[in-house]
């Protein structure tokens, strides 16, 4: 709500109908009833869509643990170094709980695939938990990574016995093979996961964070990064490449309060992701796609989609000059109106229009923000102008004829 006021952007306003009061606190949220879920499933079915549920296990279960503390290793929710502590998979009671949750979901979601999660599991509690250590000894498991693999294998067998196929994030590969599972590769810092999964015969869905996480704000390079993503690297064999089933764009909505904001984060990135997905590898034409981008924007206008206005161009974040300089910022979207400020404030619809280059004679910070012809706002840019005198020339002493060269042979990131 504060961001909506700070940035003059109603996309960040929580809808009033979604707010409710608990005591003195105004909260947002809610839950789905069984009836709600059945309505969603039926609505999606008419449109050829399967709504695949993900109940993340054994990590990301803090809400369940808060409600049922016995699910945790030490009877309470806690945090590890980066993530909340997981379920205690050493207790049979915990395993029965997990199975009962999925039994109910199988009833509501009549699909072949279910998503078990399996990511971001902090295993530090398992190292100290008597129940988990007993489980490891009983199953002959060498370490806590193998304990997670044991849990995932058990849940996979549970799903398969009920005619379902398990999906998990690429962490499910840690601690042992999971043949038959579908792996969603999301960690680009673990590139070997794709090769490992496909060698095991697993199907793989590509959704690497740096490219396909649409909850990360788009910038001037986002579209090009997706365009240049190597879908099927040469390091994979032909058989492994056939295990790559497709791509997925992820939009996590913790900070997406409205559907309008969701559209803004999805488009136009979703367009290039779709085109990458259906184009034969090696034949995607970035220039051709970019040449069609404005046509796509017009189509989105006709559909009433709140897409992100293409990034402003022709500027540098810092511009140094000696006497004066003229701005040269350009908006690729025809009909857009640019508004600017020079006092450090956020541009609003009431700020001066940027209709022609500005003459800059002194230090200043320029903010420019695009507005669609219908009034929708885009992301603003910041350009810092610094007036400087010419640097004094060096006065070399004790020089010798020739050049001195240092050669560094290494790979720089």
PLM segments and residue spans:
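Aromatic-lined ligand-binding clefts that engage carbohydrates, nucleic acids, or primary amines
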Residues: 329-331, 408, 413
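Short, compositionally stereotyped local motifs that mark structural "simplifiers"
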Residues: 280, 284-404
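Short, solvent-exposed loop/turn elements at domain surfaces
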Residues: 255-257, 348-349, 412
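Substrate-binding groove of N-acetylhexosamine-processing glycoside hydrolases
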Residues: 39, 92-113, 120, 134-338
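Substrate-binding cleft of carbohydrate-active enzyme catalytic domains
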Residues: 1-164
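Residues within well-ordered beta-strands of beta-sheet-rich folds
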Residues: 50, 54, 367-369, 413
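Domain-scale activation on soluble regions of proteins
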Residues: 41, 45-50, 57, 62-64, ...
């Amino acid at each position: 709500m504060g961001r909506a006021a700070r940035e003059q952007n109603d996309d960040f306003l929580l809808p009033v109908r979604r707010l409710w009061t608990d005591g003195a606190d105004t909260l947002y949220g809610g839950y789905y009833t069984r009836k709600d879920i059945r309505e969603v499933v039926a609505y999606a079915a008419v449109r050829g869509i399967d709504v695949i549920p993900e109940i993340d296990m054994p990590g990301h279960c803090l809400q369940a643990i808060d409600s049922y503390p016995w699910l945790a290793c030490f009877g309470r929710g806690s945090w590890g170094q980066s993530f909340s502590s997981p379920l205690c998979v050493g207790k049979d009671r915990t395993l029965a709980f997990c199975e009962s949750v999925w039994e109910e979901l199988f009833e509501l979601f009549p699909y072949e695939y279910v998503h078990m999660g399996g990511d971001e599991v902090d295993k530090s509690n398992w190292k100290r938990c008597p129940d988990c250590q007993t489980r490891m000894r009983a199953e002959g498991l060498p370490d806590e990574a193998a304990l997670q693999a044991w849990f995932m294998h058990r849940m996979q067998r549970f799903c398969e016995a009920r005619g379902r196929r398990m999906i998990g994030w690429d962490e499910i590969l840690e601690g042992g093979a999971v043949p038959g599972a579908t792996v969603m590769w999301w960690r680009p810092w673990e590139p070997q996961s794709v090769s490992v999964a496909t060698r095991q015969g697993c199907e793989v869905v590509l959704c690497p964070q740096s490219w396909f996480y649409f909850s990360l704000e788009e910038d001037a390079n986002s579209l090009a990064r997706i365009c240049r993503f190597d879908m099927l690297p040469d390091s994979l064999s032909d058989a492994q490449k056939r295990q790559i089933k497709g791509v997925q764009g992820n939009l996590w909505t913790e900070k997406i309060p409205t559907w309008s904001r969701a559209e803004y984060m999805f488009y136009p990135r979703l367009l290039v992701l779709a085109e990458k997905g259906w184009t034969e590898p090696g034949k995607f034409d970035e220039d051709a796609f970019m040449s069609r981008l404005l046509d796509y924007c017009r189509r989105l206008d006709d559909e009433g989609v709140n897409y992100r206005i293409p990034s402003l161009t022709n500027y540098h974040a810092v511009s140094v000059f000696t006497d004066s300089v003229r701005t040269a910022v350009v908006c690729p979207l025809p009909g857009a109106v640019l508004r600017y400020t020079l006092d450090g404030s956020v541009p609003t619809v009431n700020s001066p229009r940027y209709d022609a280059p500005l003459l800059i004679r002194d230090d200043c910070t320029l903010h420019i923000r695009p507005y669609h012809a219908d009034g929708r706002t885009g992301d603003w840019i910041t350009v810092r102008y610094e007036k400087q005198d010419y640097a004094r020339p060096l006065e070399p002493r004790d020089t010798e004829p020739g050049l001195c060269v240092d050669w560094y042979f290494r790979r720089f990131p």
